[in-house]
Design a protein with these regions (language model features):
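N-terminal ligand-binding/catalytic initiation module
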Residues: 2-155, 161-163, 173
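Short acidic/polar capping segments at secondary-structure boundaries
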Residues: 150-153, 182-185, 208-210
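Short internal alpha-helix immediately C-terminal to a glycine-rich phosphate-binding loop
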Residues: 157-178, 184-196
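NAD(P)-binding Rossmann-fold cofactor-contacting core
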Residues: 196-210
């Protein structure tokens, strides 16, 4: 994130981030514009943070949902039809909600959740297929710390993974990059990979549309 506006959460000695004498419950709200100002599109920084997060996961310093603490979220499915008036039904591609809670340790020491809502019919309404929000909570008290737009954050996090893979695994003199898909996530992948392999000379794309 940029130095002018550092919204990263840092824990000190893994203590609560809420002052005990402060009974107010307030939190930071970040719109998509705020997220851009905070540096969410800084692909190199995203790769570095993902490398740090994966190191914490390797150490077991994390918890995800589910009985084995590794579930990729809890999904809300809709039926194909319902006798109940106005009941939501699965009448489009990828209509679902997903709650994705987790705890991450280290200097972050924070709990959070990504709330994912998706409906293939959104395109006709001028909306993205999926709309995401992210909340961070104080892990000791449950107090909300931040509520933020999650679309750019999620795509950049996803793109940072192949960026990190290229950093650690790709041959040092790689000159050609091939991407399957030309959507938002592929753009984020391209941004991240180019930050760690700036000497790439040829980029090949394959999309589903002519």
């Amino acid at each position: 994130m940029n130095e002018d506006r550092n919204v990263e959460f840092e824990a000190t000695d893994r203590k609560s981030n809420v002052e005990p004498e402060n009974s107010e419950v307030s939190f930071l709200y970040l719109s998509e514009e705020n997220m851009v100002d905070a540096g969410v599109l800084n692909a190199a920084r995203c790769v570095d943070v993902m490398e740090e997060a994966l190191g914490l996961m390797e150490d077991g310093d994390f918890i995800m949902g589910g009985p084995y603490n590794d579930a990729h979220g809890l999904m809300l499915y809709f039926p194909k039809k319902s006798p109940i008036e106005n009941f939501p039904v699965n009448n489009s591609r990828d209509r679902r909600f997903i709650a994705m809670p987790a705890y991450l340790g280290g200097r972050f020491h924070v709990a959070g959740e990504k709330w994912y809502g998706s409906n293939g019919n959104n395109r006709a309404k001028g909306l993205p297929r999926s709309i995401l929000m992210v909340m961070l909570n104080d892990v000791e008290t449950g107090k909300p710390l931040a509520y933020m737009s999650g679309n750019l954050l999620s795509s950049m996090r996803t793109g940072a993974m192949p960026g990190l893979a290229a950093k650690l695994l790709a041959v040092k003199d790689a000159k050609v990059l091939s991407l399957l898909g030309c959507g938002v996530v592929s753009k984020a992948c391209l941004m991240s990979i180019m930050t760690v392999r700036p000497d790439i000379e040829v980029i090949k794309l394959k999309g589903s549309s002519p």
